[in-house]
Amino acid sequence: YKEYYHNAVTYSVSEIILNVQDPVFVLLMKVFTGSKYGFDNFLLFVAFLTLFFKMTSVFRRVENIYLFVFLYSSYYLCVHDYIQVRVSLALALVCIGMYWIPNKKMSLFFIITGCLVHLSTIIPVFVYYVVGRSDNNLRYKRFYYMVPLVLLIPLAFSMGFLSYYRIDRYLDYYNQASDKKGGLLRNMPLLVPALQVIGLIYIYARKKLRQNIFTFEYAISYIGILIFYSCISIPVIAIRIFDISTFFFIVLISRMKCNIYVIFFSLAFALINIRNTLILLGYNIPFFHFGS
């Protein structure tokens, strides 16, 4: 992010638009370049904006806001919002556009801005416009049947049949980061997807909860799992898309009554993500560390 800020300081607005990578994010930084602590002020501003937009957008979408805050804080607040600043801001903009703003034009403006800040948010936006605004259960069923065919594209990337320079760069970045952490990054995230799979199966298996499969949140959680396992050989992309889907999975869980299963699931989710946070921070506590 310091490189982004350097570009914001060095280049003019027109140069940023024409020549700099991720111009929308850099233009947001440009506003803060006039002060001595511009970079720090920008990070504080983004942190406030991200939390405000996310909390505001889901407030009327969940049954138990306390459960949402608990699940959100165990992962996103500690890891995702702190480390992946750009994608977190993009997701916040998309969420406020999809969930909270009633005006269609203004909603579309926030959604498009979010996608321009980080292209990964195109995935939930695609699902939202395909099925998320529909009450037609048949459309959801067709969507679930067709989605695995779409995943042949990321599978082709991960198997080497297709190539793209940013994917190659992501792989280099991930391998370097994982080497610095002694291989921990390769193992760290696998428990959370497994837990999400269990949660989705539980919702489908329970008759009282099965109607939730015909919701946008269930659909994007389903997509996140499929993309994660189909792109596992490109870990940065797999984890990034899955992280986005996990936010909506948390929304889905927060709509349910706090029975013993939801409580157990929430505690397991929090414990696993506290472990992941400790690993990222470099702590090696035997109770939390299950091997490298």
Which residues does each predicted region cover?
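Alpha-helical transmembrane segments and terminal signal-anchor/GPI-anchor hydrophobic tails
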Residues: Y1-Y11, V26, I123-T246, L280-S292
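Short hydrophobic/aromatic helix or loop-helix immediately within or flanking a transmembrane segment
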Residues: E3-Y37
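Loop-to-helix entry region of an early transmembrane alpha helix in multi-pass inner-membrane enzymes
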Residues: P23, S35-T50
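Transmembrane-helix signature of polytopic, membrane-embedded enzymes
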Residues: M55-Y75
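Multi-pass, polyprenyl lipid-linked donor-dependent membrane glycosyltransferases
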Residues: V69-F70, D81-C95
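Signature aromatic-anchored transmembrane alpha helix within multi-pass, membrane-resident enzymes
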Residues: K141-L149, I260-N276
